[in-house]
C-alpha cells in the first residue's frame, strides 16, 4: 500500500469541510426565508382602511353616500343640454 501524503489529506478534508459548511448555511437561510413568508401570510399586512385611500378619502362608508334625487338629475340635464325630456313647471 502506498502512503497518501498528509497535505493531500488536508486538502480533501478541507474541501469536504467547506462543502458541508456551505450546505448547512444555505439550508438555514432557506429555512429562515420560508418561515418569514409563512409569518407574513398570517398577518394582515396589506389590509388598509378604504376611507384613507385615494378616491375614498373622507368617506368612511360607501353605503352612506347620498344618491341623487330625480330633481337633481333633471336640473343637471338642463345644464348639460341633454336631450332628455324634462318637465318644466312654469
Swiss-Prot record:
InterPro entries: Bombesin. The modification Pyrrolidone carboxylic acid is found at residue 49. Expressed by the skin glands. Residues 1-30 form the signal peptide. It is found in: Secreted. It holds the Pfam family Bombesin. Keywords: Amidation, Amphibian defense peptide, Cleavage on pair of basic residues, Pyrrolidone carboxylic acid, Secreted, Signal. Transmembrane segments: none annotated. Residues 31-48, 61-90 form a propeptide. It comes from the Eukaryota. One of its GO terms (biological process) is neuropeptide signaling pathway. The modification Methionine amide is found at residue 57. One of its GO terms (cellular component) is extracellular region. PROSITE patterns: BOMBESIN (PS00257). The keyword Signal applies. Belongs to the bombesin/neuromedin-B/ranatensin family. This is [Phe8]-phyllolitorin. It comes from Phyllomedusa sauvagei (Sauvage's leaf frog).
Amino acid at each position: 500500500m502506498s502512503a497518501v501524503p498528509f497535505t493531500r489529506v488536508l486538502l480533501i478534508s478541507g474541501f469536504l469541510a467547506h462543502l458541508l459548511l456551505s450546505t448547512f448555511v444555505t439550508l438555514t437561510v432557506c429555512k429562515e426565508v420560508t418561515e418569514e413568508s409563512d409569518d407574513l401570510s398570517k398577518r394582515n399586512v396589506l389590509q388598509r382602511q378604504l376611507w384613507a385611500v385615494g378616491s375614498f378619502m373622507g368617506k368612511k362608508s360607501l353605503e352612506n353616500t347620498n344618491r341623487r334625487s330625480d330633481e337633481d338629475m333633471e336640473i343637471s340635464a338642463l345644464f348639460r343640454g341633454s336631450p332628455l325630456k324634462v318637465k318644466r313647471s312654469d
